């Protein structure tokens, strides 16, 4: 099981305010075929102990295409809602990504294309995201220290973002003032 501590801040919308603070996130990947897995993950708010998110996602990988596709469902808990009300925030998830290696001589520099669609329990689309990222991985920057830099642009929101990952630490920053830090345990 993969476990991480996640801290988010900087949001100005009420929805993002409910997601701020320290959360404990757990993820388990269960292989079901050579190129497919079932991914279950959830998180709890560290201060209240209340669940904030639960999800189950079927993911299929296409190695020859450097692509993957995911389909699943999720529940977002908002402001310590009791369990029956939390089911009102049930959603379906469809996500896809494709990696492009523009320089075959340097496989550590690449372009990622990502898309995600969330739909409510009646299959009405609620959230769409699409992004393009330039990703650069630097192995052994210092002994035992791998670094990954990502510069991305959210196409639908017209907003750039940045990610810096160093071994177990990840820092994300967005131009609208949001940010998050993750530490993989």
UniProtKB/Swiss-Prot annotation:
Domain of life: Eukaryota
Chloroplast intermembrane side: 40-63, 99-105, 139-145, 171-176
Record bears the keyword Nucleotide-binding: no
GO BP terms in the entry: regulation of monoatomic anion transport
Subcellular location: Plastid, Etioplast membrane; Plastid, Chloroplast outer membrane
Any GO CC annotation of this UniProt entry: chloroplast outer membrane
Membrane-spanning segments: 30-39, 64-73, 89-98, 106-115, 129-138, 146-155, 161-170, 177-185
GO molecular function, one term: porin activity
Annotated membrane topology: Multi-pass membrane protein
InterPro entries, per the entry: OEP21
Keyword field: Chloroplast, Ion transport, Membrane, Plastid, Plastid outer membrane, Porin, Transmembrane, Transmembrane beta strand, Transport
Intervals, Cytoplasmic compartment: 1-29, 74-88, 116-128, 156-160
Disordered: annotated segments: 1-22
Main function: Voltage-dependent rectifying anion channel that facilitates the translocation between chloroplast and cytoplasm of phosphorylated carbohydrates such as triosephosphate, 3-phosphoglycerate and inorganic phosphate (Pi) depending of ATP to triosephosphate ratio in the plastidial intermembrane space; in high triosephosphate/ATP conditions (e.g. photosynthesis), export of triosphosphate from chloroplast (outward rectifying channels), but in high ATP/triosephosphate conditions (e.g. dark phase), import of phosphosolutes (inward rectifying channels).
Family of the protein in this entry: Belongs to the plastid outer envelope porin OEP21 (TC 1.B.29) family.
Official protein name in the record: Outer envelope pore protein 21, chloroplastic
């Amino acid at each position: 099981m993969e476990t991480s501590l996640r801290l988010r801040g900087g949001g100005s919308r009420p929805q993002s305010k409910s997601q701020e603070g320290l959360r404990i996130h757990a993820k388990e990947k269960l292989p079901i075929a050579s190129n497919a897995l079932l991914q279950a993950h959830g998180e709890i708010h560290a201060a209240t102990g209340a669940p904030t998110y639960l999800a189950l996602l079927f993911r299929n990988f296409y190695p020859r295409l450097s692509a993957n596709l995911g389909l699943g469902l999720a529940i977002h808990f908002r402001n310590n809602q009791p369990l029956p009300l939390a089911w009102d925030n049930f959603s379906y998830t469809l996500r896809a990504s494709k990696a492009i290696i523009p320089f075959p001589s340097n496989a550590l520099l690449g372009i990622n294309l990502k898309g995600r669609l969330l739909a409510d329990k009646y299959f009405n689309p609620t959230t769409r995201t699409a992004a393009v990222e330039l990703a650069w991985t630097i192995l052994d920057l210092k002994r035992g220290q791998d670094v990954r830099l990502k510069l991305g642009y959210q196409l639908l929101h017209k907003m750039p973002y940045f990610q810096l990952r160093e071994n177990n630490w990840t820092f994300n920053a967005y131009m609208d003032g949001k940010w998050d830090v993750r530490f993989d345990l």
